[in-house]
From Swiss-Prot:
Catalyzes the reductive methylation of 2'-deoxyuridine-5'-monophosphate (dUMP) to 2'-deoxythymidine-5'-monophosphate (dTMP) while utilizing 5,10-methylenetetrahydrofolate (mTHF) as the methyl donor, and NADPH and FADH(2) as the reductant. GO terms for molecular function: flavin adenine dinucleotide binding; NADPH binding; thymidylate synthase (FAD) activity; thymidylate synthase activity. It catalyses: dUMP + (6R)-5,10-methylene-5,6,7,8-tetrahydrofolate + NADPH + H(+) = dTMP + (6S)-5,6,7,8-tetrahydrofolate + NADP(+). The active site is at residue 203. GO terms for biological process: dTMP biosynthetic process; dTTP biosynthetic process; methylation. Belongs to the thymidylate synthase ThyX family. This is Flavin-dependent thymidylate synthase. Residues 7-237 form the ThyX domain. Pathway: Pyrimidine metabolism; dTTP biosynthesis. The keyword Signal does not apply. FAD binds at residues 95-97, 103, 192-194, 198. InterPro entries: Thymidylate_synthase_ThyX, Thymidylate_synthase_ThyX_sf. DUMP binds at residues 92-95, 103-107, 176, 203.
């Protein structure tokens, strides 16, 4: 029976800042937050922090977001390894063109034992889940049958070697046409701070699909841990149905 995969978002990389020794400047932050401040101050050579209202890293970053100088947010980045996400959801995710992606390949990795991601609206309904699982298992049986027949067809006359490997890939590529969007996939996503803010603003909205909204909320919580000054203006609240959204008065980029 197909197993259900829970959403998991793991931080796997973040920006490290190395202060140049010939610049007389210090900050109370590190990593990407320090880099963002450094980039902003480099524009005006304001190393002495002449404005006391922006002397701290948090105050400086809030100011640059307030005034729309968000290009400096592009210097720092975060990478996540995301699992327990459906193919359907990643079709939406990859529309965010400022991210970089590396996703599990259905051509190279057999899908007959892949886990399933249950749509949020079915999570509290056993009957709907049983219908979903039955449909998934039926599609996998068809996938397996097609794979066997395609392998036999494409491998006819092949004696092994690189062409045999290619034929197996071609068989998987053709057979996966019947696999459901509920199949779990896994993906590495890298984005700069500006791109992550845009993603959160768009996908943590009440108007977004619930699965990708849930992903955006989990990513936001991880991002706040990495760079609180950059992401803490987003407020997470619960809707009447128990799902969560995140909003910020400073998230103005559409």
């Amino acid at each position: 029976m197909a197993q259900i995969a829970p959403l998991r978002v793991q931080l796997i990389a973040k920006t490290e800042f190395l202060a140049p020794p010939d610049v007389s400047w210090t900050t109370d932050a590190d990593g990407g937050s320090a880099l963002v401040e450094f980039a902003g101050r480099a524009c005006y050579q304001s190393w002495s922090k002449p404005n006391p209202r922006t002397a701290t890293n948090a105050a400086y970053i809030k100011h640059i977001i307030d005034v729309g100088h968000v290009a400096v947010l592009e210097h720092a980045s975060v990478s996540f390894y995301i699992s327990g996400i459906s193919r359907s959801c990643t079709h939406e995710l990859i529309r965010h063109r400022h991210f970089s992606y590396s996703q599990l390949s259905q051509r190279y990795v057999p899908e007959k034992d892949a886990q399933v991601v249950v749509p949020p609206d079915m999570e509290d309904d056993d009957e709907l889940q049983q219908i979903l699982i039955a449909a998934v298992e039926a599609s996998r049986a068809t996938y397996t049958e097609l794979l066997v027949k395609l392998n036999a067809k494409l491998m006819a006359g092949e004696l092994g070697g690189n062409r045999a490997v290619l034929r197996r890939k071609q068989a998987r590529q053709a057979a996966h046409a019947v696999l459901p969007n509920a199949n779990e996939t896994r993906i590495v996503v890298t984005g700069n701070y500006r791109a992550w803010r845009h993603f959160i603003a768009m996908r943590a909205s009440e108007h977004a699909d619930v699965e990708i909204r849930r992903l955006a909320i989990v990513c936001l919580r991880r991002l706040v841990d990495v760079a609180p000054a950059v992401f803490a203006d987003f407020e997470i609240t619960a809707l009447a149905d128990g799902t969560e959204v995140a909003t910020s008065p400073l998230a103005t980029e559409a």
